[in-house]
């Protein structure tokens, strides 16, 4: 069947061992990238269910809020490394071998009260939105600077002393 991931379609001959990722699920990408030598752990914010290959670990948190706390915690490479280093085995060609059971075998100190989880994650959500807006503002300012520099360098705009 056709598998769609990140806007691209892939043909897979056998999808029987694929996992379904739902909104709010935690997804572990078992491939090293950049600052994340043991892979990336994120919460899915895609509204629709998505099929993913067995190269991804898919975990359903107790609730969305706890998932968001984990998503925020694992945004930092040091946290992912500290969590996975003791339990992961790197194989040939840097492949990461870890079962779902082993992935869940490590522990973190997390709030257990759902109301507390909700309040903490709502704070993270507000902060994430603020950061996103500030990044967009920064990109706009960089664009303005670029346009102004082009205008100045071409002599279209002159600065008076």
Residue ranges and their predicted role:
Residues 49-55, 89-115:
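A short glycine-rich beta-alpha junction/loop motif
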Residues 19-79, 99:
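A short beta-sheet element
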Residues 2-3, 33, 141:
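Short glycine/proline-centered loop/turn elements that form peptide/ligand docking sites
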Residues 9-15, 92, 114, 125:
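Short, solvent-exposed loop/turn positions at domain surfaces
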Residues 84:
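Surface-exposed receptor/substrate recognition regions of extracellular proteins
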Residues 1-27:
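Sequence-specific dsDNA recognition surfaces
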Residues 110-161:
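Amphipathic alpha-helical coiled-coil/heptad-repeat segments
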Residues 69-72, 105, 119:
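Short, solvent-exposed alpha-helical surface patches in well-structured domains
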